[in-house]
Structures are given as C-alpha cells and as structure tokens.
C-alpha cells in the first residue's frame, strides 16, 4: 500500500460560485484538477498493463501447474508383494492428493483469471476510457465554449453605439445564448471533474479489491492470511459502500445547487465587495500622437477586485483565451487605493464605461468598460460612483491638483537643493523618469508639513532619494498644480510672444508678461528657471541642453486650459518660451521691464537687430551681382554713390575689451552682435546732419582746453562708439531728448555727443553663461604713415575737420581680470557708474536695453582665445575738437613687457590723463579707409565683421590668409546661391582659407570642396604657432 512519505497535497474543491465568476484562481484550481486527473489516468494505464502482463504469466503458470497435477495424479506406485501397507497407500494417495490440491488450486486460478480478464481488466479500461476520457472530451467542449463566448462578448462590447437598436438586441440575445451555453458547459465540466475524482475513490478501489480478493481465494495457503485480513477487508468493503452512499447523497445535493446557480448566478460576497473582468482603455502618450493616427487607444482585459472597507482595488491583466498560468506569487497584479469613481458620459464611444482615479497616481484617470449594463451598475454601486460633470468640449479634467502654497515652495526648494548638491551631472536628469510609486510617495511625504523635514534627511527614506525620483516629483508637482505656473490667463499671451518676428521682441514681450504673473507664481518660476539655468550649464555631462529642458518643461509650466489640436500644435511655442526664460534669466528676473522701451522696426533697422542663428546677417553681394544690379538701377542712381551702401567704404568693426577702474567686470562685444555693413545705408538726412562724418561715442568726462584733451575724472569706465554708417537708423539726440533709460546724453555746442548703445548692468551669473559685451565700431581714416587712426567730428556747427589720435598697438586684457569676468562674483548684478560731461550728468539704469543681445554665437572658448594675454584691459577713445591743430596725447600701458610701446608717427600726442587712471586706451584696425569731410567714400574695403585679435595675431591671420593656411569657424548656416560658393552649417571648421577677388568673400576648403564663403559668416580661429 506504500508508505506515507509521498503524501500528495489535497486539491481545493471546485465551487460553482467560482465557476460562474471564472476567476484566475478558479482557473488555476481547475488546472490542478486536470493535471491530477492526467496523472491518475497515467497511473491507471500502467496498472492495467501490469495486470495484463500478470494474467499472461498466470495462465502460463497454470498450464504448467496442471501438467504437474496430471503427472502427480497419474503417478503409480507399484508395490512389491501382493499387499501394500497403510503408509504406502498414503504415499501413493499423497501424490494424487497433491495433484488434486494443485488441480483445485488451478481450477480456482482459472476461475480467477477468467474473472480478472472479464471484470478487472475490462473494468479498469472502461473506467479510464469512460470516466477520464469523458472528462477530456468535456474539457474540449469547455474550451470551445469559452473561446466562443469570449469572442462573442468582445464583439458585442466593440459594437458602436451608432448601430440600430434591433441589431444591438439581436447581438445581446446571441451573447446571452452563448453565455448560457458557456456557463452550462462550465458547470458540467466542473461537475464531471469532481465526479471522476470521487469515483476513483470507490470504483477504482472496488475493482482492485475484487482482484485482490480473487487472489486470496485462489491461494488456499493464504486462508489464514485471509482470516487475518477479514476485518480489514470487511472494513474496507464497508468504507467503500459508505463512500458510495455518501457519493449518491452528495450527488443529489450538487444537482440541486446546480439548478439554483442557473437561476441566480451570484451570491453575497464575503471577501470582495465586487470582482470580475473589466476592459481598460490605454491611450497613447500625447507626445506620441501623430496627425495620421490621432488619439489611438487599445482596450485590455483585466480581472479586477474591490474591497469597499479598505477601498482597495486590484487589477490583473488576464484573458481566458491566451492565459499563461504562473505561481500566485509571480503574478503581476497591481493594488491601488480608490479615490473617486464616476460614470462615463453617454457620449463616449464605448458603452458601460466609468472613470476611476487612485491616490497612488494623482492626475491619472483610468477608464474601464464593464461587461454589461447590469455589471456596470454593480461596479458603480460598489464604488459609490457619481454622475459625470459635463464640462465644455475639450476642457481638461483635473482629478487632483496641488496648490502653490508654503508646503509646495518648501518641497521645491528641498528638491532643488538636493539635486544641486549632487552636482546636476546625472545624464538625462528631468528626461528620465523615476519609479511611479516612489514619486507618488515622495510627493505625499514632501507636501506633508509633518514629514517634509524628515523625508530628505532620514535614512528610512533613502530609497526615495534617487535623483530621477526627485526630479520627476518636482515635475509632477508643477504639472499637477491647480493652475499652471504661468497661468491660464497669460497662456495665449506667452504663445503670441514666442511667435514674434525677432528674438529681441520675443524676449521683451516675455519679460513683460513674467512681471504680470501673481507674486507666488513669479517667485516659484524664478526659483525653477534659476535651477534649470544651472542644469543647462552642465550640458556636457547631463546632456540636458536648453532646448531639451524646454521640451521637458514646456508642457509643464505652460499648460493650456483646453485640450485641442491647436494646443498640441502650440507645444513647440511653449518650449520656445522656456528657452527664452533660461537663456535670459538674469535679464528677465533680475531687472524689471521698462515701460518706455520701444522695439526697433526689424524692417527699417535690420542692422541693429540681434542676429540669431536662425536669422544670419545679410551676405556681401559678389561683384557680379552688384554689377548686374547696378545695370538695372536696383542699386540706385550711379550719380550718387554716397547714398548707396554697396559703394560706401565699409567700416571695419572690431571686438574691443573694456574694463572699469576697479570693480567693473570685463566686457567685450559679441561677434554675433556686429551688424552687417551692407545694412548701414547712409541716408541723405544723416549726411546733412553735420558737416563731417558723425561718430556718436560714449566717452569719459573730458574738457577741451586749448585743443588739449583733458579728463575730468581719472577712470574711463565706458567707451562705446557707433560708426558713421549707423546714422541712417540712429538719429542724433539733442539734450532736450535725454532718455536716461537708454543712457543717452545730448550735448549742446562745444560738447561731444554721448550715446550708450548698450547700457547694461553686467551680472556675473548670466555672463558666465552668455558673455555680453559692448560693441565698438570705428571708422578708420587715411593713414599719414604706417600708423592707424580713429577719428570723429564734433557735432558743433562749422566743424569740418577732425583731430586724429594715432594708436599703433593694443594693450591686451589681463588674465586675472578675464578670469574675474567669466567666473563672476557673488555681488550680483553690477551697474555702470555715472558719467559726467560738463553740466550734464546721468546715471545708468539697471534695465537691459532691447537692443542688447541675449546670447552669443561664439563660445566662451573662442572668446578666451581672442583675449588670451596677461596684460590689462583697455577701452577705445574717440576724441573731438573744434581746433584743427595737433592734439598731443600720451597713452600709458600697465605692462609693456610683451608689447611694443605706443608710438605717434605723424602727430605728436602728449598724455593728459589723470594719475588715477589705470586704463590703456587702445584700438585695433585692419587696413584703413579714407573718408572725406563730407562723409563720402573714396575706396572700398573689406566688409564683414571681425573679432578683435592682438596685433601679432592679426598680422599672423593676414599672413595665413595671404598664404592660404588660415582657419575659420562658421557662425551661421549658409546655402550656396551660385556656382563656386560653399554651403555649410554652424560650427564647422573651414581650412586653407585665403583672400578672394570678391570683396567681402573669402575662399576656403570644406569636406574636400573649395569655394567662396561670406566673410561675415565666419570668425577666424587663433593662429597656430
């Protein structure tokens, strides 16, 4: 009978209640029953085989035993003599007796074998085929009915609400019929499995009992053993009979219960308030929506349970047609806490739908579809569902929103503090999302004032302190605010600001709108953008550029009130607004917008607009194009070449470095901010405004004493010049039109007109990101020798001549001051000190001029290359005088070890600078240009702007251009418009650059192709020595 070591664990009964619900647990239990039945079938099959083999062997044995019995019975003892003794008679009869015993035994064997062959083997075969085989047939029918019902159910649920009512009724009736057949077959199958399992206990054992009894009867020698086992056998028979009686009684009750469940399919739940199958709508991400496949959704079948007391909702993806059984601990079911339940509006594309939200996933709405109207009502009732709130079409429904309160500010500060302490160098920060459960937990704890102090420092919350989790929690808080940080009120205004024609207009409009935000919104936005600014500085390591941050935070900070196709298409403008805020953080958040700022007309004054990479400067026309235009009259009258910008002497524009006496950081003009020479058309009004060429300059306070240039204070703090060619777009400003916001000073007769082109406070933080420099333009005049000159005429009437200041060398920037410029200081934004001129004085304001660019196309590295030196920084001087006599002036340099002394070759200049002035006034020029007093050009020069270089670097560049070994870096994208012109992208290196025969054009090689390149589209790289 075997020991008790391999006792199999009992199977759980198959309840009809579970059969109706058809839960995954029921399916698993059913599968265990099926496996156990297969195992039993296999064992019975082996037993039948062994019994057959035994019967065959027993028949052979019986034949041999009968032969032996015959031999024993026929054995004849012959007696010697005429009489035998009793012993001999007993001996002679013993063999016959033996034969008779063996015969009797073999007769019983024959009976036993006949009965075993007829009743044992046939009964076992019949039991296995009819009972276990019948279960397998039922399983096939059950699987077929299951598949047919599920497919019918899904077809019914997928029917559109636009179908006719009779079609829906027919489909409903068909589904009901299939459902009834499926349930009938399911109940029958469950009943049959349990019946077979129970039949094994008595029918199978009863057959084997008969087999054993036959063998015991067969063996006469086993009579005592039979007597010993009589009680056992009798007891076994009694138990078998009792089991049979129990089976008959249970079968009657089960039949009654089956009838009961066919009439009423459910009973009051004990563990779960409601459970069953639901279909979940899974929509594609809004960022993945395309115009070809908008709002594509899929419906996935889940087995769901709900406990009303704990409001615990579990969902497990499961489909009976393609299920895969796993261990209960390996199932990936999701447990959530129900927050709200709302019936879906009847206008929805599917029937029987309702929306659920959960505390673990705020702001996420789950849309489920029930299996029928009745099932739909049961779910709504169990979850205390509410009727839908009918909003306007396209309204965004926010299930749970955060508020911009003190707890929110504290949470954001803590998140930013932790992230910045870690260095902001995690790759993909704010792009890679953290674990959803951790994010929700961190938000819940961080916004709880009792827990917020501990969550960022307590070791038990260490698993929540991953950088991606913190960054995702910060984003989720901002995204789920009851109103976006930049408010619904100004959303369309921000979008319109991002659609402005020029970058400066966009920046100024965004600047104004930011200061219209409520104070809490402004403070939070200031904190977030300041943090994102720091993130963007670590772009090389975290790969989060300003553009990437705009993509991530655009929909978060600028959320539309209504969800529509138009709002989706405007997402790119959300990103542009965020890019502007990050790129111009210091300008926008540290300086209030001025009410009297007037933006220049981009169509009338393109020369002073900020040239972005998307709006590169106008290229210098080639000679062939100029000739063609001139022949058709497109360039104006040939008799008045002075009014034609193409025939004007193009001024050389240089990058000049300026330094204050002690505290001012280094400033330089940005190469990207230099206007195009061909845009500086010299109009007739500008030509008539003065007798000579005007150069409006911002100079230190000086007095003209007997023709000598004399300073009134010892430090030159700001020096800014604007070329004569800009007078067509920048009018002369008299003293009656002083505009302090722009730092403009007008002077009467006898004074030099001062105008600040970019009156900007320099912030150490912003300058580290985007170095903003003063732009200085100069009109080189005819050299009387080899020295270069810069001159300007006075604005006084009758002044037709100019004084010339001869400068031959440049004092390069000091390394320490250059480092101070790029590293900045902790003192925050700094302002220019006031400049006095005679009786007129003014103070620089804090705001940024709208003409000031917000970024440069040249990298910090290129600026450093152009400024690499160990000497002091300088400022350029432009001086005027009513006298035509010589002006003697001496220029002092702080360091003369590496540079040649300043020389005056044709004019004797003597120093008259104060003893406290530590500035070296310098300028660097390329080939000079001769201008007459009337301002007409006598010869044409090279057009494009050029970065300032030290004299020896400039000479080296000249030599490299002459020999064809110069190297340049492209600043803008350019598409070759005619044969012989190169096409290139920004930040490409062009080699073998040399002068060309076309004015304003160079010749170079890129990717093995040689052609012309516009000189104002490139900057020279530092020569290799």
Swiss-Prot record:
The record marks 431 as: Arginine finger. Keywords: Coiled coil, Cytoplasm, Cytoplasmic vesicle, GTPase activation, SH3 domain. It is found in: Cytoplasm, Cytosol; Cytoplasm; Cytoplasmic vesicle. Disulfide bonds: none annotated. Residues 271-388 form the PH domain. It comes from the Eukaryota. GO terms for cellular component: actomyosin contractile ring actin filament; cellularization cleavage furrow invagination front; cytoplasmic vesicle; cytosol. InterPro entries: AH/BAR_dom_sf, BAR_dom, GRAF_fam, PH-like_dom_sf, PH_domain, PH_GRAF, Rho_GTPase_activation_prot, RhoGAP_dom. GO terms for molecular function: GTPase activator activity; phospholipid binding; ubiquitin-modified protein reader activity. In the adult brain, expressed in the antennal lobe, the subesophageal ganglion and the alpha/beta neurons of the mushroom body. Interacts with Egfr (when ubiquitinated). The Rho-GAP domain is necessary for inhibiting contractile ring constriction during cellularization. GTPase-activating protein for Rho family proteins. Essential component of the CLIC (clathrin-independent carrier)/GEEC (GPI-anchored protein-enriched early endocytic compartment) endocytic pathway. During hematopoiesis, inhibits Egfr-ras-MAPK signaling by promoting Spi-induced Egfr internalization through CLIC/GEEC endocytosis, thereby preventing plasmatocyte overproliferation. Essential for normal mushroom body (MB) development and consequently the formation of olfactory long-term memories. This is Rho GTPase-activating protein Graf. It comes from Drosophila melanogaster. The lineage of its organism: Eukaryota, Metazoa, Ecdysozoa, Arthropoda, Hexapoda.
